[in-house]
A protein has these predicted regions:
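Short, solvent-exposed loop/turn segments at secondary-structure junctions
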Residues: 49-53, 115-116, 153-155, 176, ...
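Conserved core segment of the aminotransferase class I/II
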Residues: 111, 251-332, 345, 432
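N-terminal "arm"/small-domain region of PLP-dependent enzymes with the aminotransferase-like
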Residues: 2-88, 98-99, 226, 381-384
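Conserved PLP-binding active-site segment of the aspartate aminotransferase-like
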Residues: 364-370, 386-428
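Short amphipathic alpha-helices in soluble, non-transmembrane regions
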Residues: 375-381, 420-424
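Conserved glycine-rich beta-strand-loop-beta hairpin in the small C-terminal domain of fold type I
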Residues: 325-339, 351-366
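Conserved core of the PLP fold type I
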Residues: 71, 79-224, 235-257, 372, ...
Length: 443
């Protein structure tokens, strides 16, 4: 991930350097452009990281992969149409995703569609029964428990904590992961029990945790029942021909003497069918026993037929890579369109900076302080559906009101380009209004 304010145009056009009269004229021109966009009433959706129809169609073989009774049997003789089998999922599917998760198949669990459900369950099990066998439940701590939340981050992580009354502490990101000096300072508090991490192509900033960051997270002082909720949602989701390197956190934790610290999550939600895929957990052998013993009271087992379909269609690491290359080719032009438009419209203005992600599903846009909510409100008025401003921070509160998450994956590339152009207009209107207000010009 790299951050950009775009290349400067031939003449300096930083808005802050314009005279008040020139800035007022600029604002009025952008307002007129905005009204024209509103009049066209073209709806756009940049709200969520939703795969496009063409992307999910790449996995249509899943629809027919298991078509006869004879195909329903596993290599160890289990009928996938019936009850039971390993609570960790088929050994075939655990082998398939072991490399992606960074663990041997024995330390992998493959469940039903949602990795978010696995994160939720792991947190609730720790809250109610302790984070390891014999440990005190988190809820029985003498002080309210706390979670570290690298921000901007994934809103659904934060919603789990909010749902269960877990205090959240925002930690700034650096471009190579969270500010580790701050993380280490905060984690020394025994009331801090966990940390949310999207370590590769982070949502929404696109950054990948550096080797130093992973090593420090693995070895830092923390409560004995502190857990890294390592949501590796974008493990194989590159936008360029070269994948970012992410160190294996399970190996790093084991080497640091904290083998049970990390819970690694993944899914096929943005690989095959977004809501008919597989969720996964990889962790230490002790943690796996802990999780399975609790999960077994919740469910007899996962959808084995769907696991078998994925094995038959994706086959092996090479099959996953080939499939994701097709995904990349569909996504890359959409992200390129956002970059081209922002460079042309916002470059050199001094009022916006945005990421150029090498993978993942988002572009993170920072505007002038106290402007993000106004930008998103203008976007809504122009028919652009966005995630609410502030949603990328704990409790939905961006302390600087500047971050906006952009999800270009779902619309066609031409619509992404038009939406990015309309959004740029909203940014220019909102920020020119703010600069004028700072000069005492409110009309």
């Amino acid at each position: 991930m790299t951050q950009s304010d775009g290349a400067a145009s031939a003449e300096p056009r930083e808005l802050v350097r314009l005279s008040t009269d020139a800035l007022r004229e600029f604002r009025d021109r952008e307002r007129a452009r905005y009204e024209a966009i509103k009049a066209r009433a073209t709806p756009f959706n940049l709200a969520r990281g939703k795969p496009a129809t063409e992307q999910v169609a790449l996995a249509n073989q899943l629809l027919t992969a298991v078509a006869t009774p004879e195909q329903c049997w596993t290599e160890d003789g289990n009928d996938c149409r019936n009850y039971y089998g390993s609570p960790q999922g088929l050994i075939e599917v655990r082998r398939l995703f072991a490399a992606m998760l960074g663990a041997p198949p024995e330390q992998v669990l493959v469940a039903n569609n949602s990795s978010l459900a696995l994160m939720h369950d792991a947190l609730v099990y720790a809250l109610l029964t302790g984070a390891s066998d014999g440990a005190a439940p988190w809820r029985d701590q003498h002080r309210p428990i706390r979670f570290l939340c690298p921000s901007p981050g994934y809103d659904r992580h934060f919603q789990i904590c909010e749902q269960y009354g877990i205090d959240m502490i925002a930690v700034p990101l650096t471009g190579a992961g969270p500010d580790m000096d701050e993380v280490e300072r905060l984690a020394a508090d025994p009331a801090v029990k966990g940390m949310w991490c999207v370590p590769k192509y982070s949502n929404p900033t696109g950054e990948t945790y550096s080797s130093e960051t992973v090593a420090r997270l693995a070895r830092m002082g923390a409560a004995g029942d502190f857990r890294l909720f390592w949501d590796n949602a974008y493990a194989v989701h590159d936008l360029t021909g070269r994948s970012d390197r992410l160190d294996n956190v399970l190996d790093a934790c084991a080497a640091a003497g904290n083998p049970d610290r990390a819970l690694v999550f993944g899914s096929t939600s943005k690989i095959t069918f977004a809501q008919a895929g597989l969720g996964m957990l990889a962790t230490s052998a002790a943690n796996m026993r802990w999780f399975v013993s609790r999960q077994s009271t919740r469910t007899i087992g996962p959808d084995k037929l769907n696991q078998l379909r994925h094995v038959l269609v994706l086959r092996d690491d090479a099959g996953i890579s080939a499939h994701m290359e097709q995904q990349r080719r569909l996504l890359e032009p959409k992200f390129a369109a956002v970059q081209e438009v922002f460079k042309a419209r916002l470059g050199g203005t001094g009022i916006a900076a945005w990421t150029r992600p090498r993978g993942g599903y988002f572009v993170s846009l920072d505007v002038l302080d106290a402007c993000a909510q106004r930008v998103v409100a203008l976007a809504k008025g122009a028919g652009i559906e966005m995630v609410p401003a502030g949603r990328t921070f704990p409790y939905g509160r961006d302390p600087r009101d500047r971050n906006i998450r952009i999800a270009p994956s779902f619309p066609p590339a031409d619509e992404v380009r038009a939406a990015a152009d309309a959004l740029a207009t909203c940014v220019l209107v909102a920020t020119s209004e703010r600069l004028l207000a700072d000069r005492g010009v409110n009309a």
